[in-house]
């Protein structure tokens, strides 16, 4: 080892010494040898090191303009290795480039602690690096024969016992020593969090690095650190005795002193090649650097021998470990049975005795190669790699982790290949078959006398098959019966979020003091985005003139004097509400263990008469809970349910083209993609189908279920498994090919979003009109009636035809409107729901799994939600039951049987509904998601009819939207006039309908639309909002123009007329 102004500090007995010129260089493993030790103090199994490390070290150097090394007290601070090579540098100015060696002649010392003398160096930092030096019994004798230079530290000599007489003589002199030729004992390198252990890398007969198959003690070769190969050892010993030469060397290296507080390390290139004379070498496959990299380290490529560093003023310091990889984890003492001494930087760490053992610690995978640095650049600090937010990357990482979790085994690791797709295919087929049997047993037996007359043995055989699959299900369906007079814990304060909603929508603050004079910045080309949340600077009873005056300051002073722009934040969930709900349902649900304590039962209301359905308490109940299951409503209102069967629907419009989602059926308790990997991805392939063809497909599916029931009930116990496999194979073979789908997997066709428009389905719509007014899709006062356009599936009725295993992924309703889902049957559906106040946590979890919050393509893990304290409502919706999903409730649904569901949205005319929709508007704008409900247009249309003027909270929420949008139109008109843009009435230009959406962000554009088009409209024109940047491809050969739907005069008249009575 060599270095400039570096020294080796250690302790022997009670004596302390310092060896100047020592610093770590390269280390390598060598094979055991029975040769005579070539150097005094070496064991017979030890040989000099061949500098043939498999990884090119990054050399470091210390500038010449440095102070001399400091002296140290051996007190209460622990020292380690300070090196910027393979070992990370210890970031402490006092100990840079110093190697602490703890050696006691023939007797092991358990620990060593030191501290710097200087008071300015007391804040010694901890580090992860440490070097253990072991197995050199006669190190002191070797140093004596080498005439080493020692520096005594008498203040630390107190409790070590008898000293070696030979060594006492040595510490009284300060003779010279060429320390770069001194051979050190075995060195093992480790870190706190990740150990790099030389003992677990064994050089076999073919010189290939391998790892022992177990962690039992293995005799390993010793590691020596020197400056050359075997053929240079004699030269090394001769140089040690050359005191004059060493004295001159040391004086040259200490001419310039080190600074008191800082040492600058500089990397310099060092030749790092294999030794010709050594029997141990590295092949091209062992090295982690390319041939070109090796040439750059040895430009002339003259010799493969290690070239000792010159005695120039530049100091080179390198350390390497032979081919340490992630699979090389092991215990230091298992592989190195001889005495080892710990030297670390953590003063609180326990001492390490000679017979102590360590548990193997996995080694971190090596990252990217460090780029080569110049000699003047400081070393690049190691930093944690930035966490990528790319959804595809995150999704692949999650899938890989889930795949590795499936391969875990309690015993020793086994090499086996798992085809997850085959396992998933078998599990899917078995689960589907079990659900088919349940469907036939529970729902079809009433229509088929042959099924009812099954013998008991055949019935038991079917029940046994069903039971073996039900045992593996963790359904935990929870329902709690409630009455019309039930009072919820959050009655009048929906989910304890009223303060949150009011703060975002109806809060007024004092505007900031305006600066004097006009602003010198340029006038913006377009106004800022129209946001509906944040505190207002104007009160809700202001006039339109006050709004226009405040908005005029944007052009003159470049400030927004209407409202304060604040970034939207999700609500903070009130955990006390969860405790109150547990107490409310405690009598009915008592099996909530620690793991299931975050489960909430679904309140189920059973109605029997029409009076109960039309009572005020019925409406109050539905608008209080997050989600409510209603039983008996169809019978109480005498609704003709048979009109909603699939055959009847197909008769009304047989040629109707419907959307089909092709999915792989599976249990609702988990989720796998089509390749069998556990993840959150919902695999669906879209296609089209005529309604009459889909009706025939559903009939075929039901017939297959009947056939499976007959076959399994007739087979014996021995034939059961083979019969099931045959049925599953026949099902896959009989299915039609689906474009983009794996034909070896079982697929189902989910008929989704079948629009029941009144002109084709008048009979069905007449039955829906029997419901209470607040549940009707087109009721008076329903906010969605004022959207100005028909939004399919929102203010229209849709039907969903579901075979077994159909999935509706997790989602919130558009603009967080409430929704109604009526299960016509005959089968059941499984529902999952999460209350509104947890949408912030859900958004974060969804992003961590590589999905976007608003994309309906994921199936959340029930287990993960419960572990993170997110309440989950899970229940089973039976035939002819209606589920009312309140505003903002996050939910996902799966059919466990054949079902027909009828669904639509309702916009309840209350503050909670309007406020949550306003929050959703800004959230959609921030994340670039399309809001299907044009909320701003909806508010102005409702204001035209002077709705909700007598409801104080609804009035304030409405006026807040109107104030902001009126000011935005004023901003736009002012900027158009200032820049002299082309503008015209939308009716004159005849470009499009009134409700427009931005081409980029898909957000609603209120009143004024930006276009890039031609005079003759020969090219397609796209609308753009005020804040999106338009690409050049939409500007080329086109001109900019604006259209408006409402003049300022029209908006002012509506605004001033909307006042309380």
UniProtKB/Swiss-Prot annotation:
KO phenotype (gene knockout): RNAi-mediated knockdown results in abnormal gonad migration with aberrant turns and positioning of the distal end as well as in disorganized accumulation of oocytes in the proximal gonad arm. RNAi-mediated knockdown also results in disruption of invariant Y-to-PDA transdifferentiation. RNAi-mediated knockdown suppresses mitochondrial stress response mediated longevity. RNAi-mediated knockdown reduces lifespan of floxuridine-treated animals.
InterPro entries (alphabetical): Corepressor-Demethylase (IPR051630), JmjC_dom (IPR003347), KDM6_GATAL_sf (IPR046941), KDM6A_B-like_C-hel (IPR048562)
Localisation: Nucleus
Keywords, sorted A to Z: Chromatin regulator, Dioxygenase, Iron, Metal-binding, Nucleus, Oxidoreductase, Zinc
Segments for region (Required for binding of unc-3 and for function in Y-to-PDA transdifferentiation): 418-759
GO-annotated biological processes: regulation of gene expression; transdifferentiation
Binding site for Fe cation: 811, 813, 891
Gene3D superfamilies assigned to the protein according to its UniProt record, in alphabetical order: 1.20.58.1370, 2.10.110.20, Cupin
Tissue: Mainly expressed in head and tail.
Family from the record: Belongs to the UTX family.
Protein name stated in the entry: Lysine-specific demethylase jmjd-3.1
Organism in which the protein naturally occurs: Caenorhabditis elegans
Gene symbol of the encoding locus: jmjd-3.1
């Amino acid at each position: 080892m060599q270095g400039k102004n570096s020294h080796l500090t250690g302790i022997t007995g009670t004596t302390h010494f310092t060896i100047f010129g020592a610093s770590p260089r390269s280390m390598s493993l060598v094979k055991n040898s029975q040769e005579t030790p070539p150097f005094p103090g070496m064991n017979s199994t030890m040989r000099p090191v061949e500098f043939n490390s498999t990884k090119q070290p990054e050399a470091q150097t210390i500038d010449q303009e440095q102070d001399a090394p400091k002296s140290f007290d051996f007190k209460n601070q622990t020292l380690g290795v300070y090196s910027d090579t393979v070992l990370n540098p210890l970031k402490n100015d006092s100990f840079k480039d110093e190697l602490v060696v703890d050696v006691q002649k023939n007797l092991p010392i358990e620990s060593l602690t030191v501290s710097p003398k200087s008071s300015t160096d007391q804040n010694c930092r901890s580090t992860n690096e440490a070097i253990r030096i072991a197995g050199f019994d006669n190190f002191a004798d070797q140093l004596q024969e080498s005439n080493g230079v020692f520096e005594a530290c008498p203040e630390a000599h107190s409790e070590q016992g008898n000293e070696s007489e030979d060594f006492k003589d040595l510490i009284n002199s300060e003779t010279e020593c060429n320390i770069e030729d001194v051979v050190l004992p075995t060195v093992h390198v480790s870190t706190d969090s990740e150990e790099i252990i030389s003992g677990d890398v064994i050089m076999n007969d073919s010189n290939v690095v391998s790892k022992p198959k177990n962690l039992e003690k293995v005799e390993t070769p010793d590691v020596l650190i020197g400056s050359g190969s075997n053929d240079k050892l004699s030269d090394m010993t001769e140089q040690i005795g050359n005191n004059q030469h060493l004295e001159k060397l040391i004086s040259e290296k200490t001419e310039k002193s080190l600074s008191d507080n800082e040492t600058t390390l500089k990397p310099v290139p060092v030749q790092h090649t294999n030794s010709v004379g050594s029997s141990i070498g590295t092949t091209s496959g062992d090295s982690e650097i390319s041939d070109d990299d090796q040439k750059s380290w040895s430009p002339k490529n003259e010799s493969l021998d290690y070239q000792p560093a010159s005695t120039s003023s530049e100091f080179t310091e390198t350390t390497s470990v032979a081919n340490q990889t992630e699979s090389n984890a092991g215990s230091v003492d298992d592989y190195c049975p001889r005495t080892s001494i710990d030297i670390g930087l953590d003063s609180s760490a326990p001492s390490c005795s000679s017979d102590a053992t360590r548990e193997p610690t996995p080694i971190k995978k090596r990252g990217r190669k460090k780029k080569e640095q110049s000699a003047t650049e400081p070393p690049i600090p190691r930093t944690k790699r930035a966490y990528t937010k790319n959804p595809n990357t995150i999704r692949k990482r999650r899938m890989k982790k889930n795949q590795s979790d499936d391969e875990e085994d309690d015993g020793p690791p086994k090499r086996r290949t798992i085809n997850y797709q085959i396992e998933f295919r078998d599990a899917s087929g078995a689960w589907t078959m079990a659900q088919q049997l349940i469907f036939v047993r529970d729902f079809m037996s009433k229509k088929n006398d042959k099924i009812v007359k099954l013998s008991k043995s055949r019935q038991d055989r079917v029940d046994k098959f069903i039971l073996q699959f039900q045992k593996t299900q963790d359904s935990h369906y929870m329902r709690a019966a409630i009455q019309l007079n039930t009072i919820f814990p959050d009655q009048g304060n929906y989910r304890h979020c009223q303060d949150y909603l009011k703060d975002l929508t109806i809060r007024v603050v004092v505007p900031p003091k305006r600066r004097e004079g006009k602003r010198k910045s340029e006038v913006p080309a377009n106004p800022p985005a129209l946001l509906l949340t944040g505190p207002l600077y104007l009160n809700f009873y202001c006039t339109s003139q006050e709004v226009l005056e405040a908005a005029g300051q944007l052009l003159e002073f470049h400030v927004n004097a209407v409202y304060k722009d604040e970034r939207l934040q999700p609500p903070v969930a009130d955990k006390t509400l969860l405790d109150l709900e547990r107490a409310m349902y405690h009598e009915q649900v008592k099996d909530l263990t620690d793991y299931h304590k975050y489960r909430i039962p679904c309140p189920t209301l059973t109605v029997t008469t029409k009076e109960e359905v039309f009572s005020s308490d019925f409406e109050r109940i539905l608008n209080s809970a997050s989600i409510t299951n209603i039983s008996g409503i169809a019978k109480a209102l005498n609704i003709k349910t048979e009109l909603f069967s699939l055959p009847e629907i197909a008769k009304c419009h047989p040629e109707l083209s419907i959307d089909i989602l092709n999915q792989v059926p599976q249990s609702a308790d988990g989720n796998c993609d089509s390749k069998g990997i556990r993840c959150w991805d919902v695999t669906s392939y879209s296609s089209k189908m005529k309604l009459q063809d889909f009706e025939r497909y559903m009939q075929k599916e039901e017939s297959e279920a009947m056939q499976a029931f007959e076959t399994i009930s007739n087979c014996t116990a021995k034939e059961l498994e083979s019969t099931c496999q045959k049925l599953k194979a026949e099902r896959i073979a009989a299915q039609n090919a689906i474009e983009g789908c794996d034909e070896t997997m079982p697929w189902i066709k989910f008929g989704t979003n079948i629009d029941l428009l009144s002109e084709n389905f008048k009979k069905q719509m007449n039955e829906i009109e029997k419901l209470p007014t607040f549940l009707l899709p087109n009721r008076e006062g329903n906010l969605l009636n004022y959207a100005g356009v028909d939004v399919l599936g929102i203010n229209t009725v849709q039907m969903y035809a579901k075979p077994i295993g159909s999935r509706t992924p997790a989602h919130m309703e558009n603009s967080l409107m409430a929704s109604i889902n009526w299960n016509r049957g005959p089968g059941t559906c499984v529902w999952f729901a999460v209350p509104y106040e947890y949408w912030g946590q859900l958004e974060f979890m969804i992003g961590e799994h590589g999905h976007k919050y608003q994309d309906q393509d994921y199936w959340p893990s029930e287990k993960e939600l419960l572990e993170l304290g997110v309440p989950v409502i899970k229940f089973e919706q039976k035939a002819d039951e209606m589920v009312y999903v309140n505003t903002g409730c996050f939910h996902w649904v799966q059919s466990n049987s054949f079902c027909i569901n009828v669904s639509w949205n309702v916009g309840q005319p209350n503050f909670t509904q309007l406020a949550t929709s306003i929050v959703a508007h800004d959230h959609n704008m921030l994340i670039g998601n399309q809001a299907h409900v044009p909320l701003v247009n909806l508010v102005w249309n409702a204001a035209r009819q002077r709705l909700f003027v007598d409801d104080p909270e609804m009035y304030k929420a409405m006026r807040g939207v109107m104030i902001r949008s009126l000011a935005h139109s004023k901003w736009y008109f002012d900027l158009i006039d200032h820049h002299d843009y082309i503008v015209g009435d939308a009716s004159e230009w005849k470009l499009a309908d009134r409700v427009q959406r931005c081409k980029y962000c898909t957000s609603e554009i209120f009143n004024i639309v930006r276009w890039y088009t031609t005079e003759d409209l020969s090219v397609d024109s796209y609308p753009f909002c005020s804040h999106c940047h338009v690409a050049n491809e939409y500007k080329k050969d086109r001109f900019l123009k604006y259209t408006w739907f409402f003049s300022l005069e029209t908006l002012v008249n509506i605004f001033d007329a909307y006042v309380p009575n």
